[in-house]
Amino acid sequence: MKYGRIDLTKTNYKLDDNASILINPNMEALNIIYTDYCRYKRFSSVEPLFNYEILNSDVIGYFDNSDLVAFSIISHLDEISVRGIQFAWNYKNPSLQLGWKANFHECAWYKALGYKYYYLGGHHPYKENISGYEILGPI
C-alpha cells in the first residue's frame, strides 16, 4: 500500500464560502451523512464514526444552501501536519462536486493556518490531480 500527502506550500487553492468549522457537531447528522455516503459508494466494509475522533479533531462542514450535506474530520498531527481522517457526503446533489471542493478548501484552510503537510492516507490515482500531491516513499 502506498500513502500520499499534499505539500501545502505547492498549492494555491481558495477557501469555499459554503464551508465552516463545526463547533459541537451534531453526531446524529454526521452519522446520517456518513451512512448515505457509504451506501452511495457501496463500501463492503466500513468503520463507524468514533466520538473520540470527532471531539479531538476539526470537523469541517460543507453546506448546500443552509443544509449540512458533507463533512471532513481532520486531526492535527504536529505543528506542520494534519491528517484527513474521514470525508463523507450525502450525494443528494452530485453536481456540487464536494469531494474536490473539500480537498481544495482544506488545503487553503490549513495552509493559511501555517501547516505544511496534509496527509490523505492511502494513495489513489485521482489524488494525483491535487496540486502538491506526493506519494510517500520508504523510511
Label every model-predicted segment:
Residues M1-L22:
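Acyl-donor-binding surface of acyltransferase catalytic domains
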Residues Y3, Y13, Y34-Y40, Y52, ...:
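Sequence-level detector for tyrosine residue identity
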Residues N18-S95:
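A conserved beta-strand-loop-helix scaffold within acyl/acetyltransferase catalytic domains
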Residues A70-F71, H76-I135:
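Acyl-donor binding region in acyl/amide transferases
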Residues P138:
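Patatin-like phospholipase
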